[in-house]
């Protein structure tokens, strides 16, 4: 039987490192369960499209969508506690320029929604912010999904009791090209967790933008690659209690902005103004100068520790503490040309990290490495801590 766990609980489990919120098994054969029905979608099913399922879904239902392409199919999901899951592969919602309510491919109005194994692409709206998912309900978990060629990948509203967890998912080539639409845009919610994901090739906008009160951006691959032209890699415009740990961050040659991580640039409006930037690898390939971290606001608590900075001379612009960061043009990468940023045995970053301590009860020492594609590998206990986000090649 499939037991639902709230998005809030999943976020707590994942960010605390108690146990990963991994993909849950599909419900067993019976078409009903103690929490709701199982609605099956596909060419050979009574419900041929996801939108047909959305029209009849009740609270607690699980919608199993056969792996296939559903061109031009858009939907509003109003029921609470839904599971929306692609089966036996990815269910591709190829909007082809269409949208629900001139907002998104899927407008999710219900609370506590789980989305797995779904690909959403091609949303366009007159306001130029057509999203793969527009989250209007409270609480969303997204896992093993893909968002591409929309004007926004995911766009959420403001809800001070909403928690957003996104993991093992990919965002690319989203944006209207105007700088106001992004691969991923989280509104003023309680917490946002992004882990084991890849965000790349935003069309002028940011790879990750969040106004959440708390942000946990952990073990991701955030890159322009050869031909991307994003703005900020990570934008936290209102600050917030934010942990940025173990990410591979790259500014490409065509990046629009010279700042990788921007904090509180639109005003320190969130209750907490604490930023911990620990064990990230930053590669700047812009010809112009670049800054790894720019901080605004008065008297925020900011610590940048154990970061590996390549191609930029500036780690931190603005208030804060910078400790044990390695700025070098000779980092000892295994194969930088192929974006393999693991360390060779002779790298000056190998084993050169220091204990970053804790933020409250949150342990700042990285527990994982990002692993392509869209995965992770645990950091071996007892290994000396490197500087940067990557392990030694061959280990």
Q: What is each residue range found by the language model?
A:
Residues 13-21:
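Bacterial N-terminal signal peptides
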Residues 2-14:
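Bacterial N-terminal signal peptides that target proteins for export
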Residues 68-69, 88-90, 338, 353-357, ...:
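Acidic glycine-/aspartate-rich tracts in secreted/extracellular proteins
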Residues 23-26:
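N-terminal signal peptide c-region/cleavage motif recognized by signal peptidases
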Residues 72-75, 92-108, 116, 120-342, ...:
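Glycine- and acidic/polar-rich repeat regions and solenoidal domains
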Residues 59-67, 71-95, 108-112, 349:
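Beta-solenoid repeat scaffold
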Residues 346-395:
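Surface beta-loop-beta hairpin patches that serve as ligand-binding interfaces in beta-rich domains
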Residues 34-69, 347-348, 386:
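Acidic Gly/Asp/Thr-rich repetitive segments characteristic of extracellular carbohydrate-active
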